[in-house]
Structure formats: C-alpha cells, structure tokens
C-alpha cells in the first residue's frame, strides 16, 4: 500500500472508522445527482466477482451509488478530509505535478491512489476497506468534474459568481449541479440514457490511465470550456449548450473508469 496522505494518521483513524458505523441515509441534495449517476452506470459494468465483494464490504443494502455520495455527507464530519476532493493546479502548468501541487499527498489524485490500494488490500480491516470504497466511488466522480482541477486563485470556480437565466450561483456549483440538473429524467433514467449512448470503442478507450492522467484531462477541459464564461458572468445559452455534452461525456467516462478500477482492485 502506498504511503498514506497526511490526514490519515493514527490520530484520525479511529474517527474515520467510527464514521463507518453511522447509519447512512443518502441525502437528496441535487449535487449528489451526478455522483449517483456515475455509481449507477458503474454498478452495471462490474464483474460478478467485484459486485459480490462490494456487497460484502458495504453495509447491508448500500449500493455503489449510495457509497458515492457518502463522502459529501457523513464524510464531511472530518474536516481534514476536505482537501481530498480536489487539486489546485497553476494556471500555466501543463499538468498535475505532485511535488508542486500536492506535496503533502492530501489532494484527490494521491487520495484516490491510496484508497484504491486500500480497497484492493484483502488483509486490511473491513472498516478501512469500506471507507476506502466510498471514497474511491466518490473521488473518481470528482476527478471528472473539470473544476475539481481548477485554479487556486478562485478555488476551482467557487469564487466566480455566475448567472444563468436569472438564477445566480458560482461557477463550480454550476458545473457540479446545475448542468446535471438540466438533463431530463431521474437519476436512473439519465444513467440508462448515457449507457445506451456508449459505444464499444468508448468503453475500451476509457478503461486506461490513472488518476494523474484523468486529472490532466479535466485540467484541459477546465481551460477550454469551464472558464470561458465571458466578462459579465452571465452565462449564455451557447456556453451551456457547449458544456452539456462535456458533462454527459464526463459522467459516462467516470462511470466506466470507476468500474474498471474496481474490477481490477477486487479480482
């Protein structure tokens, strides 16, 4: 197992494990929608062996979609885990560099590496594997939302106010949630529609890479699409229509990669 990131020390471990004992009632806040869609699609692409092991690791009745939203709710009780949901990369950098961007290993790239290894470790305590599985399911989704690899100066778009058709929010929230909410249907219907649009070539091509590569892909998209808001902060219909296919593709891509990662980890 790789070296643990800074927050995962003996000081906090007991608290992390205690969180696993909490009753989990998945919330319905709308930013959960994207994570649940990723979990639903990924669930359908698991091997029989991986599915059985996930059922053994997670508490009774919890699905991969439920696990994917857990870190944004019960997991938020541990503030030291907050930086694990993103990485901040300098505006002119060509890609993620751990020494520069994550020297303490407390960002989504290194956390996903560590949690993936923990899921795969059959000698690890079941409670640790449970915690790790929830974070793997969540962080793969975060990693495919471009602004989770956004600039430090605006906290990945959180400090950029935007408006669309009279409703104001921030740029990060707009990509996290509003764009997903524009899709018609409930989570299951959207997941089925995205799955139906997948090609065999997509599935094959996306089952590759690692967290660094996936983060670099998001970095390119955050520059080519997300930050092109215009000076006024009023998002145009053209901006939204260009962003929506990006969001659909990244949801599907995250799901296929999550399933691929778990299928390999749980062989």
Where are these regions (language model features)?
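N-terminal secretory signal peptides that target proteins for export/translocation
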Residues: 1-7
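Bacterial N-terminal signal peptides
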Residues: 9-23
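N-terminal, motif-rich segments that launch catalysis or mediate targeting to/interaction with membranes
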Residues: 25-139, 146-267
């Amino acid at each position: 197992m790789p070296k643990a990131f800074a927050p995962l020390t003996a000081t906090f471990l007991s608290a992390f494990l205690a969180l696993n004992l909490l009753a989990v009632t998945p919330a319905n806040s709308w930013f959960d929608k994207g994570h649940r869609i990723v979990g639903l699609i990924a669930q359908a692409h698991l091997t029989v062996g991986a599915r059985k092991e996930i059922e053994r690791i997670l508490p009774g009745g919890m699905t991969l979609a439920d696990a994917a939203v857990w870190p944004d709710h019960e997991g938020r009780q541990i503030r030291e885990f907050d930086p694990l949901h993103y990485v901040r990369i300098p505006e002119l950098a060509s890609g993620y560099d751990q020494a520069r961007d994550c020297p303490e290993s407390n960002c989504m790239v290194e956390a996903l590496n560590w949690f993936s290894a923990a899921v795969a470790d059959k000698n690890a305590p079941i409670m640790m594997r449970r915690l790790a599985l929830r974070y793997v399911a969540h962080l793969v989704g975060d990693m495919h939302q471009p602004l989770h690899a956004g600039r430090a100066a605006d906290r990945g778009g959180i400090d950029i106010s935007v408006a669309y058709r009279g409703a104001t929010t921030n740029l990060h929230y707009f990509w996290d949630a509003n764009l997903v909410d524009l899709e018609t249907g409930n989570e299951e219907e959207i997941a089925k529609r995205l799955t139906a649009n997948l090609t065999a070539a997509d599935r094959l091509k996306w089952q590759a890479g690692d967290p660094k590569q996936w983060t670099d892909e998001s970095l390119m998209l955050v520059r080519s699409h997300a930050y092109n808001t215009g000076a006024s902060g009023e998002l145009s219909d053209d901006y939204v229509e260009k962003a929506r296919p990006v969001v659909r593709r990244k949801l599907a891509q995250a799901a296929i990669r999550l399933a691929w990662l778990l299928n390999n980890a749980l062989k």
